[in-house]
Amino acid sequence: MKQIELKILDARIGNEFPLPEYATPGSAGLDLRACLDAAVVLAPGETQLIPTGLAIHIADPGLCATILPRSGLGHKHGIVLGNLVGLIDSDYQGQLMVSVWNRGNTTFTIQPGERIAQLVFMPVVQASFNIVDDFDTSERGEGGFGSSGRH
């Protein structure tokens, strides 16, 4: 298992609020919690930036982290990420913040310590470009937006 540096920015983490952990041996994501002093009420269409009380430093340029929505919050309550996905670069060292958007039709209350998103680590490939006039022919070519069929 890869070791990532974690800085606790709020004393409640690890005491009142659990440290991020994998729910099962097969889990890809670690739950991130709302590190709030009081509940936050999100009206329909509203977006708020929610602190997690944590900072990470991945350090390895071959890795990044993504902040992803929790499927149950999105499906049942319309609570998703305001930026759809958060990308955490390997050299970032600031607090992890979660942009939470209520795309639903009713207000939703986020409680202190509530699980609001998940953190997934992923490999990174940094690419360089080779400028060309034409590409080698492929089966797909320039076809996009459904050109490969519906089913």
UniProtKB/Swiss-Prot annotation:
GO terms for molecular function: dUTP diphosphatase activity; magnesium ion binding. GO terms for biological process: dUMP biosynthetic process; dUTP catabolic process. Its EC number is 3.6.1.23. InterPro entries: dUTPase, dUTPase-like, dUTPase-like_sf, dUTPase_trimeric. Its cofactor is Mg(2+). Pathway: Pyrimidine metabolism; dUMP biosynthesis; dUMP from dCTP (dUTP route): step 2/2. It catalyses: dUTP + H2O = dUMP + diphosphate + H(+). It comes from the Bacteria. It holds the Pfam family dUTPase. Keywords: Hydrolase, Magnesium, Metal-binding, Nucleotide metabolism. Substrate binds at residues 70-72, 83, 87-89, 97. Belongs to the dUTPase family. HAMAP family: dUTPase_bact. This enzyme is involved in nucleotide metabolism: it produces dUMP, the immediate precursor of thymidine nucleotides and it decreases the intracellular concentration of dUTP so that uracil cannot be incorporated into DNA. This is Deoxyuridine 5'-triphosphate nucleotidohydrolase. It comes from Tolumonas auensis (strain DSM 9187 / NBRC 110442 / TA 4).
